[in-house]
Curated annotation (Swiss-Prot):
This is Metallothionein-II, hippocampal. One of its GO terms (cellular component) is nucleus. It comes from Bos taurus. Gene3D superfamilies: Metallothionein Isoform II (4.10.10.10). A divalent metal cation 7 binds at C50, C57, C59, C60. A divalent metal cation 5 binds at C34, C36, C37, C50.
Length: 61
């Protein structure tokens, strides 16, 4: 559990624009909370599924 995120590892969460997640490990996370997505990723805000670094992110590949 990320102390700065209200979701468990592998779970799902919907972060507000002011999301403070620093190491979000959610299976699915909305908004720009996921560190795997580069800044400005339009698809990430629609519901990115993070699986690793930016080059492995399903929404930005």
């Amino acid at each position: 559990m990320d102390p700065n995120c209200s979701c468990a590892t592998g779970g799902s969460c919907t972060c507000a624009n002011s999301c403070t997640c620093k190491a979000c490990k959610c299976a699915s996370c909305k908004k720009s909370c996921c560190s795997c997505c580069p800044v400005g990723c339009a698809k990430c805000a629609q519901g990115c599924i993070c699986k690793g670094a930016s080059d492995k992110c399903s929404c930005c590949a």
